[in-house]
A protein has these predicted regions:
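Conserved post-catalytic alpha-helical subdomain immediately downstream of the catalytic base
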Residues: 231-232, 256-316
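Active-site metal-binding loops of divalent metal-dependent hydrolases
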Residues: 22, 157, 269
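A short, aliphatic-rich alpha-helical micro-motif
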Residues: 11, 146-147, 188-192
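Conserved N-terminal subdomain of the carbohydrate kinase-like
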Residues: 13-16, 24-151, 306-319
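Buried hydrophobic positions in well-ordered alpha/beta secondary-structure cores of metabolic enzymes
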Residues: 65, 74, 91, 112, ...
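Conserved phosphate/ATP/ADP-binding segment of small-molecule kinases
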Residues: 159-250
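Short acidic, glycine-rich surface-loop motifs adjacent to enzyme active sites
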Residues: 149-161
Length: 319
């Protein structure tokens, strides 16, 4: 029996709180047959019968955790609008307990992708930052909601929903909670004291600069980990897999993807799977290995998607 097998019957013990920037991912599908006479751009004739809506950002993290069988709550801010209501419907259908503060001053973030000729032609983003008052209300709710949760996932998409993330980490760690952070931007001091921070390769380069060798990367990653006072730094590296940096230790997981169709949302799947496995009692290094497998599965799907337990078990059995 592989070490991860016995934990699959324990996934319901993972009680996850996801906090962060949510959005609605919309996909319009069509055909491309000609170039516009108005500008050198393709014309996409939309098939009105082919469209898709999925929760994105922190909502996608919550969806992935729920799909694995965890007990999941989501805390975020949306606008008082149709996309916000649609998000709430989709989350409820997936079994996520969503606590969405409605801010009439903002629009729910929507990412509209137009797909033609089997590829994404372009993306249109609709977004505004939430108000200070709503964010303070969310911070107060956070203090109450973490009581019965064993893992907190903070999903930062840089949309303003995690303005008080430093306070959230401080409160959660004071209560002994495992805190995972999917970071954004170049100011990682806000994540000080978290348990694990999970930047991708590009995000890490923004903070520590480029590296020319594995030894240089290790030195930079360990220096950042120590500076932030986090237990571990998990760097996702696309085709190069992912690397975990702990105190006096580096461990690497090679990439598992057989085919890559779409990398959007892969980081959400990785941190969600990591959180669920830790919440079920799995040791960190084993949880990273499982999360790596989940990431390899989801990049083989088009658009933001989730990984089902049977898919994950199958991939682990074949590894």
């Amino acid at each position: 029996m592989k070490p991860e097998d016995r934990f699959f019957s324990e996934l319901h013990k993972a009680k996850i709180l996801v906090v962060g920037d949510v959005m609605l991912d919309r996909y319009w599908y069509g055909e491309v047959n000609r170039i516009s006479p108005e500008a050198p751009v393709p014309i996409v004739k939309i098939d009105t019968g082919r469209s898709k809506e999925t929760p994105g950002g922190a909502a996608n993290v919550a969806m992935n955790a729920a799909a694995l069988g965890a007990n999941v709550a989501l805390l975020s801010v949306v606008g008082d609008d149709e996309p916000g209501r649609r998000l709430a419907e989709l989350l409820e259908k997936a079994g996520v307990s969503a606590y969405l503060h409605r801010d009439a001053e903002v629009s729910t973030t929507v990412k509209l992708r137009v797909i033609g000729a089997h590829q994404q032609m372009f993306r249109v983003d609709f977004e505004t930052a939430p108000s200070h008052e709503v964010l303070l209300d969310k911070l107060a709710d956070f203090g109450h909601m973490i009581a019965d949760r064993n893992v907190i996932i903070l999903s930062d998409y840089g949309k303003g929903g995690l303005t008080h993330i430093a306070s959230m980490i401080e409160v959660a760690r004071a209560r002994g909670k495992t805190v995972l952070v999917d970071p954004k931007g170049d100011d990682y001091s806000r994540y000080r004291g978290a348990t694990v921070v999970t930047p991708n390769r590009s995000e890490l380069q923004t903070v520590v600069g480029r590296w020319k060798s594995e030894d240089e990367l290790t030195a930079k990653a360990q220096a950042l980990r120590e500076k932030l006072g986090v237990a571990a730094l998990l760097v996702t590296r696309s085709e190069d897999g992912m690397t975990l940096y702990e105190k006096d230790r580096r461990s690497h997981e090679p990439a598992r993807a057989r085919e890559v169709f779409d990398v959007s949302g892969a980081g959400d799947t990785v941190i969600a799977t990591l959180g669920v496995m830790l919440g079920a009692g799995m040791p960190l290094r084993d949880a990273v290995s499982v999360a790596n497998q989940a990431g390899g599965i989801v990049v083989g799907k088009l658009g933001t998607a989730v990984v089902q337990p049977e898919e994950l078990r199958g991939a682990l059995a074949a590894a």
